[in-house]
Amino acid sequence: MYKLIAIDMDGTLLNDHHEVTEEVRDALHAAKAEGVKIVLCTGRPIGGVQRYLDELNLIEEGDYVIAYNGALVQNTHTNEVVSELSLGYDDLTSLYDLSLELKTPMHFFDSSNLYTPNRDISEFTVYESYVTQVPLHFRKIDEVPKDILIPKVMFIDKPENLSRVITSIPKDVREKYTMVRSAPFFYEILHSEASKGNAVRQLAQLLGIEQAEVMCIGDNGNDLTMIEWAGCGVAMANAIPEVLEAANFQTRSNNEHGVAHAIHELVLAK
């Protein structure tokens, strides 16, 4: 019996209209009623998750969320931070210099805001702010507080340009950080120990749940570590090839209530 289900949001929990369908909502409630811990595990900031936590009633005592691709693990009932891994100002300045060298826009977060140092604001930065409902600000790098804590920096660009950028990142920079492509136009840069897999593992240990009792559901590159670590890794039908290959089970797409199908097949039917 699975005791913890960690679920990615965009492309997994949510359909392409950024909605939780009734079928998915009912399956989550049924699993929770059976005592299964439901944890949203997303690249989004907390502000971009909260309305879904409220909608799904994942804000009760003992409920948790994993945000910023594993850089933050937080109790949603008390807001107590279980784990937080951040980049600092020196990381920001070096990554900004790299973005200029590679000719790619970038943006970054603090605990509650999204910032861009690019005066010509990228359409993908605007999209990120809109989808996550996080306030967007233009901020020159030399105006950023030196004590800032940054959950993640993102290089953003058209998919073909971003692919070129990714292959051009120097090896020493790659080795210094966790880097994941979370969407065709998003490349995320985090603390070296931050990943969805590490965050799910840490939370399972905190809750006394064995690896074999954990199911993880996802679709994109930032989900790969948790899909590989889980006792049962579930790939959406719309997942990238690497996730499909790593998964133990393939469910339907995010527009076909895939999360509900996986829960019915692997949890509620047992």
UniProtKB/Swiss-Prot annotation:
One of its GO terms (molecular function) is magnesium ion binding. Keywords: Hydrolase, Magnesium, Metal-binding. The active site is at 8 (nucleophile). It comes from the Bacteria. Pfam families: Hydrolase_3. GO terms for cellular component: cytosol. Belongs to the HAD-like hydrolase superfamily. Cof family. This is Putative phosphatase YxeH. It comes from Bacillus subtilis (strain 168). The gene is yxeH.
